[in-house]
Structures are given as structure tokens and as C-alpha cells.
Swiss-Prot record:
InterPro entries referenced in this protein's UniProt entry, alphabetically: Amidase, Amidase_CS, Amidase_dom, AS_sf, GatA
Keywords carried by this UniProt record: ATP-binding, Ligase, Nucleotide-binding, Protein biosynthesis
This protein's encoding gene: gatA
Designated name of the protein: Glutamyl-tRNA(Gln) amidotransferase subunit A
Known EC number: 6.3.5.7
Organism placement in taxonomy: Bacteria, Bacillati, Bacillota, Bacilli, Lactobacillales
Purpose: Allows the formation of correctly charged Gln-tRNA(Gln) through the transamidation of misacylated Glu-tRNA(Gln) in organisms which lack glutaminyl-tRNA synthetase. The reaction takes place in the presence of glutamine and ATP through an activated gamma-phospho-Glu-tRNA(Gln).
Length: 480
């Protein structure tokens, strides 16, 4: 079973009618993943024993539908590695809230997708389990850190996958792979069972080829959770109710900082075409400013690395995961962490530890926290007079494998247009805008709205999707 031309609705219809059984669907999905992943390497673990729930109720749209899970989201009894050597053999004995909700909706968890180690990266090249390739061009990166989930969807291995987004890790790979991806409002989806990177920024979201499929999955995973104090108890609307609408009268803000000369010409033209499409259909386009955009990258890396240095203290080689051979306890800690963590993770632990140190805390971490407040205020001001903010997801399309992995500053700057949404805790998504006329690779159109207003994000994304029908295109890298 290849999902390039399938949706959750089409699968639901086939399962309801008996055109295919849920058991056969799972088997066919696994067979297709094995075949396709020889090229893509989107999965770390495939559950070859995956079986649908018993007594399927096809009134549940996800009943019997195979879903992939990013490998930093805990799955009971199914290996969860965060793409790290230090967790290479970790098999959890409990379930994350989002996976429990998917199983309650009778979805079939088919496997765990590749990612940058501990979600630290923008290319899925820091994984202990090897690079993931971009289905549009096998010599290009799929983006990161949710590159495996994005590539699995784009290559038709699954119809939808969960990812996580700390500074753009759903939206950037969605952009690079020509699919839809949404990071919900911070607190809209429980983080219980998400392996923490930066706890004030992390959010679980959904990736799919079609906008409606992500809406269907978000309907299931969103909502309150007693085990996560940061989750809102606000009622979860039916996100599919925001689809099939026009954009007449919608107030659309375009930050001038997002359309600068730093954005590749092919990316800028594709994004401008979508803005003109909105204008032509009655949307009100307003040029605005996000004046603190130039500070978002250093602010983010100070805050995120500081939180990561604390969160990753728990990996010590004692309770679970990789343990190095050692002569004494101190050596267990030192060698297990030195050998278990990759270079990028160690780099961020060191940066965070420095930013939190006595001599640097006021100068770095405290200042970054203050700038984060200013970034939030920038968004609040714009949303007083606008419904959504739009622009590119990234300044460039997917870059060559191994071309930026050794240039940390360039790699970090890949996130300059996505970080702010995490800082402000607002919902943000990427929907395909077309192919770049200069590189021939997919371009993502970013849509942001105020907190808990995923509805407007889905409305605009669905309108763009229905207008350009990018989903009809097949990734060139899959052609034999």
C-alpha cells in the first residue's frame, strides 16, 4: 500500500466497504515501508507485528489507519531512541498521551521515524541511525528535526505522522518535502511522554500530505491531560469545520523581515504568488514589522540549550539506555555520556551549561528571557489588527546532504523564520506553495495565528491547498 494518492477519508471508505481489511492494510504498509525505506531511511523502527485494534468502529476516522510516530515520542513496548546512541536499546514500559489517544481512536501505530538526535538539528543528519533522504531529490536533506516523519509522508509510506516542533522542526521539513505540517499552540497537545528538548518550546504536532488529514489527527490528540500541567483545558473544536471556506475579508499580515533579500529568489516568488492569490480572493493584505526577528536565533539557542542541558542530565548510564564499560561510578557517568551523545547534542549541553553558570546567567539567559518577552509582544500587537501572519518557512529550499552539517551558524540560521512562533507559543503551519523556479524543490508557505486559533491556520492552509493542488505532484526522487 502506497499512500501518495490516499487520504484518511479514502482509507476509511475502503475499510468500511471491506475493499481492504485493517490487517491487510497494516501488512501492505509494512511491506511498502521496507521497500521504500531502502532509498529514504525514514524509519528507525518498524513494528512488524503491528496489528489493528479489535472490534474496529469505522465511525472513528482513524480506525485501522496506520500512523507513524517520531522517535522522541514514547511508545509502550516499541523501541524509542530519540535517534541517539544513548537510547539505542530503550524500550519504554509506558505510553505517551498522544499515542494513547491515537490507540483509543483505534489507529494502528506502524513504527518510529528518524530524526535529528534529541530533536537537535535542521537536517536529520545528526541521527545515530543514519541520514534520511529527501524523496524529491535523494541527494538533499529532508530538513529536521522531524525529517523522518516528513519523508515518510512525502514518499507515501504513511498517510500521516506525528512530529515535534521546538524551533521549526515540523514546519521546516514539511516545507522541504512538499507536505503540510502544523505546530499547534503551546499547551494544545499534551507533552506527556515526549522526550524533552526544551520544555517551554517543545510541542507535538502532525504532518500529512493533505490539510484535512492533519485536522483529523489533531482532533484526536489535542486536549486536556492531567499528567501535563502546561496543557490547556480549553475545549477542542472540530478542526475540519474550518475547511472549505473562502478568505474574503481575512486580515493577512506579511512581515517585511520575512520577505528580505536573505530569502532565496525562488522561495520569495513562490510565497509572493500565494499572497497574491489570497489578495485576489478578497483577503486584506497588510505589511507589518516584527522588529525583534534579528534577535530570535541567538535568543532561541540560549534558552533552548539551557533547558536542554537540564533535561539531558537524566541520561547517566545507570537507569536505562547505553552504559559504557567503566572502572568506577564517575567513569560510568563520564564515558556513558561522552560516548552516548553525538557532537551536536554535546555542543548544546555545553552552551546551555555555560549560559546558566553563575558568571553568565544574567548576561545571557536572563537577557534572552527578556528578549523573548519582546518577541511575544510583537506578535500580540500584530494580532490586534490581523487574523494571520504569513511568509516563507525557510529562506531556502532543501540543501545538499553534508553541505551545512559542519557549519553550525549557517545551520542554526535555517530556523530564523520559524523560531518566533515557538517563542510566542502560537500555532503555525507550513503548506506547499509550489516548486522553486531556481532549485526545483518544494517551498513552504508559513501561516501563524494567535494562541488557540488553529482554525484560521487550517482555513488559510486548506484554501491554498485547494487552489494550487500541489498534492497532485509526485516526488521526483521516487521515480525508478
Amino acid at each position: 500500500m502506497n499512500y501518495l494518492n490516499e487520504t484518511i477519508d479514502s482509507l476509511n471508505d475502503k475499510l468500511k466497504s471491506g475493499a481492504v481489511s485493517a490487517d491487510q492494510l497494516a501488512k501492505d504498509t509494512i511491506a511498502n515501508i521496507k521497500k521504500t525505506d531502502e532509498k529514504i531511511n525514514a524509519f528507525i523502527t518498524v513494528d512488524e507485528d503491528a496489528k489493528p485494534a479489535e472490534d474496529l468502529d469505522f465511525n472513528n476516522k482513524l480506525a485501522g489507519v496506520p500512523i507513524a510516530i517520531k522517535d522522541n515520542i514514547i511508545t509502550n513496548g516499541l523501541k524509542t531512541t530519540a535517534a541517539s546512541h544513548i537510547l539505542y536499546n530503550f524500550e519504554p514500559v509506558y505510553e505517551s498521551t498522544v499515542v494513547a489517544k491515537l490507540k483509543a481512536a483505534q489507529a494502528t501505530i506502524i513504527g518510529k521515524t528518524n530524526m535529528d538526535e534529541f530533536a537537535m538539528g535542521s537536517s536529520t543528519e545528526t541521527s545515530y541511525f543514519g541520514d534520511t533522504k529527501n524523496p524529491w531529490n535523494l541527494n538533499k536533506v529532508p530538513g529536521g528535526s522531524s525529517g523522518g516523519s516528513a519523508a515518510a509522508v512525502a514518499s507515501g509510506e504513511v498517510v500521516a505522522a506525528l512530529g515535534s516542533d521546538t524551533g521549526g522542526s515540523i514546519r521546516q521539513p514539511a516545507s522541504f518535502n512538499g507536505i503540510f505540517g502544523i505546530k499547534p499552540t503551546y499547551g494544545r497537545v499534551s507533552r506527556w511522554g515526549l522526550i524533552a528538548f526544551a520544555s517551554s518550546l517543545d510541542q507535538i504536532g502532525v504532518m500529512s500530505k493533505r490539510v484535512k488529514d492533519s485536522a483529523e489527527v489533531l482532533n484526536v490528540i489535542a486536549g486536556a491531560d492531567d499528567r501535563d500541567a502546561t496543557v490547556s483545558e480549553k475545549e477542542v473544536p472540530d478542526y475540519t469545520s474550518f475547511l472549505d471556506k473562502d478568505v474574503k475579508g481575512l486580515r493577512v499580515a506579511v512581515p517585511k523581515e520575512y520577505m528580505s533579500d536573505a530569502v532565496e529568489e525562488g522561495v520569495r516568488k513562490a510565497v509572493e504568488a500565494q499572497i497574491e492569490l489570497l489578495r485576489a480572493n478578497g483577503a486584506i493584505i497588510n505589511e507589518v514589522s516584527l522588529p525583534h526577528t534579528k534577535y530570535v536565533v541567538p535568543t532561541y539557542y540560549i534558552i533552548a540549550s539551557s533547558e536542554a542541558s537540564a533535561n539531558l542530565e537524566r541520561y547517566d548510564g545507570i537507569r536505562y539506555g547505553y552504559r559504557a564499560e567503566a572502572k568506577n561510578l564517575d567513569e560510568v557517568f563520564l564515558k556513558s555520556r561522552s560516548e552516548g551523545f553525538g557532537d551536536e547534542v554535546k555542543r548544546r549541553i555545553m552552551l546551555g551549561s555555560f549560559a546558566l553558570s553563575a558568571g553568565a546567567y544574567d548576561k545571557f539567559f536572563l537577557q534572552a528571557a527578556k528578549v523573548r518577552t519582546l518577541i511575544c509582544q510583537d506578535f500580540d500587537k500584530i494580532f490586534e489588527d490581523n487574523d494571520v501572519i504569513v511568509g516563507p518557512v525557510s529562506t531556502e529550499t532543501a540543501f545538499d546532504l553534508n553541505s551545512e552539517i559542519s557549519d553550525q551558524i549557517k545551520m542554526y540560521n535555517n530556523d530564523i523564520l520559524t523560531i518566533s512562533a515557538n517563542m510566542a507559543g502560537i500555532p503555525a503551519a507550513s503548506v506547499p506553495a509550489g516548486l522553486s523556479e531556481t532549485t526545483g524543490m518544494p517551498v513552504g508557505f508559513q501561516i501563524m495565528a494567535k494562541r488557540f486559533d488553529e482554525g484560521h491556520v487550517f482555513q488559510v492552509a486548506d484554501f491554498i491547498e485547494r487552489s494550487n493542488k500541489f498534492y497532485e505532484q509526485t516526488p521526483a526522487g521516487l521515480e525508478d
